[in-house]
Amino acid sequence: MVVQYLLFSNDKNVDPTNLVLRQDFLHQKCLLISVSNSSHIFHEMLSFRNVRKDDFIIEFFSENNVCSLDNCIAKKIHYLSDINTFDMLLSLDGEYESLIKWFISVNYFEALQNYQHLVKSLSLKTDLMFYAVSKNVSIDVINFLIDMDCKCTIDSITRAIAEKKLDIAKIIIDHNPSENIIHESLYCLSYEKQKDLFKYVLENYKIDSRYYHKSLIYWMINKDEEIMCDLLCRIDIKEFSKEKNISSYVIQSNSLNVVKTFVEHGLQFNPDIYLWVNGNSESENIVRYIIELGIDYRPHIDRLLKICITSGTFSHLEYLINLGVSQENINEAFLTAVSEDKFELIKYLIYMGADINYKNTIAASYTDNIDVLKYLIEKGADITTGGSNDVINHAIGSHQSDFCRCLLENGATITLDDRDELMVIYRELTNGCSYEDDDYEDLDQLTNSDLRNLIHEEIMNSC
């Protein structure tokens, strides 16, 4: 039986004049539709994803299943750049939703204009704007869909914002600035940190002030003081302060001005507010302000000291210690300073009485900095950790030769007794060479004690 086919392709794949394939695989590069067996031409065009508006359609007949174009009889070539081609296709497939979506997906503005009666009909039942936003469409297509009274939904706007298509989002918002649209747009712009468009919407459209609450929370998390202050001028701060967990968001704003504004409007804190403090200079000013308000800092002093140390802020660390801290607080801060290699803070905390062997744990185990190690040894650190020598054993396993040599020179002893571990360490220290080339015939004959001695020798002799 002779079957009519439509072959969608381009001249990279098919020679349309001679009906010759330029590629080996027909179905991978071209869309082949049997007209007799399919009434969903447009759906297949859309699903194939590779049909473009500069492609052509070869209409031909074949008696057998088509695996190549040999023995096929071409009837006509239809170019998709010719609008009349779609009249022919519509005569074969009256389901035009996929066709309109294909026009949108390939930015075929002229075709959309030509079939605007179909666009208007379809827009009543399908969210064409949302579909357009999900594609890489031009502004002309967006404006055309608006002119065709296509719905501008919240989903369309949030999709555009999420995909950073802010020019499209702005057009859609301007076309449908309902209170709900503005509310959701501001919220989504806050979440996506799109400051410029947020400011545009804020300045050009007014909504009930309670709708600003969710946006303000996100700008607090974003730490944008300019936007926060603008929104604070537009809301009832006392009403906003009733929001759940608002104290934590106020602190996360990282703005002393914002914190003071809320306190002036009656917001009160409890000691757990210190859990939301960040490690930077502005947060330190906020901490001092909250302490001056009388909020007890002592339940969270270890955390506050740790933040000072990790951020390397000497003045704030000194401020907190001068307020009054326990010996244990100083010791914990000291271990943090060692682990962070903050030399000046280590010196200061030792001066303030930090126990260098706090909890029978050598502080040296908290660092891999050779200068810090030497300083700790100078100040009396127990590098043998009560005889267990955990520090040297750990350092050897981490391949820190200079660090290990310093420990061995100051009395540490290698006590590892796992043979496999000793063998691995020794071979790595000798770059995989066996000791049999020197004094021993077979490395496997060495005792654990021999291996420890060899490792000690390799470390001490390393450059």
Curated annotation (Swiss-Prot):
Pfam families linked to this entry: Ank_2 (PF12796)
Keyword Membrane in annotation: no
Keyword Ribosomal protein: no
InterPro entries found in the cross-reference section: Ankyrin_rpt (IPR002110), Ankyrin_rpt-contain_sf (IPR036770)
ANK repeats: 124-154, 156-181, 242-271, 273-299, 300-328, 329-355, 356-385, 387-416
Keywords tagged on the record: ANK repeat, Repeat
PANTHER family documented for this protein: SURFACE ANTIGEN BSPA-LIKE, SURFACE ANTIGEN BSPA-LIKE-RELATED
This protein's name: Putative ankyrin repeat protein R579
